């Protein structure tokens, strides 16, 4: 067992203890504001080096950003759907996970969210109006490949965001955001080359969305899940035909933007 000389607690251990308390505050208090280093020194009764080390620990975890220079201070970043999706995406990218693998995972998970929407007792008042509005918006972008893809993906994001189970919403929402980023990159590339699918195919996607909303409104969960899976497979095939063996890319600017657009929880 390692002993501490002169009975003093190592600075690293002090910093970890301070970091643990600040971490708990960030996670437990929604609008937590980090005190100044001077105040933290007083609150914890420790040295400035220990406080700075604690902040470095939290910064590596993505919970704070320490501002250097004359301004100083630190900004708090409370974890949410956006950060969950981004870090998951980086993990998949590091593991060299392909778009084909991500698509297969979504095939198993996303359609169940459509079924859960159909089981909500308040679906007629909460879910259906929002999904219908999203479809109506996408209709206005038929003929504009990039904008239509973005709007159509927003519909998928909404379906997941209305899933009552928080754990499923966070997990599946992260995968949906990652896929959306890849599909939007595909749309931009195909549009530049004049190869984006025809307006007829875009209109078919709109019809598929409307049929799905009809099943959700009627409370037919099994049929909603079946339709969602069939539609998802059809739209994924367009991307996988060219990019199926590419590795998920969460670090690209477009991917980060798509992930940041994840909708907040909708219960």
Language-model region placement:
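A ubiquitous short alpha-helical element
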Residues: 94-101, 118-122, 139-143, 192-201
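Sparse recognition of residues in long alpha-helices and their boundaries
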Residues: 38, 122, 129, 175, ...
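Alpha-helix N-cap/helix-start motif at coil-to-helix transitions, marked by capping-box chemistry
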Residues: 12-16, 100-107, 125, 129, ...
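Conserved amphipathic alpha-helical segments that form helical-bundle/coiled-coil interaction surfaces
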Residues: 106-189, 208-209, 223-237
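Short linear motifs at protein or domain termini
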Residues: 1-108, 112-115, 119, 246-247, ...
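Hydrophobic side-chain positions on well-ordered alpha-helices
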Residues: 25, 141, 160, 215-216
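C-terminal all-alpha effector/ligand-binding and dimerization domain
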Residues: 180-267
């Amino acid at each position: 067992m390692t002993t501490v000389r002169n009975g003093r607690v190592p600075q690293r251990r002090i910093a970890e203890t301070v970091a643990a308390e600040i971490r708990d505050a960030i996670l437990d208090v929604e609008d937590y504001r980090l005190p100044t280093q001077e105040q933290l020194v007083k609150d914890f009764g420790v040295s400035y080096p220990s406080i700075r080390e604690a902040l470095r620990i939290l910064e590596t975890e993505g919970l704070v950003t320490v501002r250097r220079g004359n301004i100083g201070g630190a900004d708090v970043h409370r974890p949410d759907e956006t950060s969950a999706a981004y870090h998951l995406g980086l993990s998949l990218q590091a593991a060299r996970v392909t778009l084909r693998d991500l698509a297969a995972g979504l095939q198993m998970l996303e359609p169940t969210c459509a079924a859960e929407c159909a089981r909500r007792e308040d679906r007629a008042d909460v879910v259906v109006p929002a999904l219908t509005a999203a479809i109506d918006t996408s209709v206005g972008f038929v003929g504009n490949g990039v904008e239509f893809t973005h709007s159509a993906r927003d519909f998928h994001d909404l379906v997941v965001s209305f899933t009552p189970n928080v754990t499923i919403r966070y997990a599946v929402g992260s995968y949906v955001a990652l896929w959306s980023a890849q599909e939007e990159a595909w749309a931009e590339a195909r549009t530049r080359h004049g190869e984006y699918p025809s307006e007829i195919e875009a209109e078919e996607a709109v019809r598929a969305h409307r049929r799905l909303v009809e099943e959700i409104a009627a409370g037919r969960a099994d049929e909603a899940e079946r339709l969602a899976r069939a539609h998802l497979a059809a739209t994924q095939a367009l991307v996988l035909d060219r990019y199926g063996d590419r590795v998920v890319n969460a670090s690209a600017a477009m991917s980060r933007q798509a992930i940041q657009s994840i909708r907040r929880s909708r219960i």
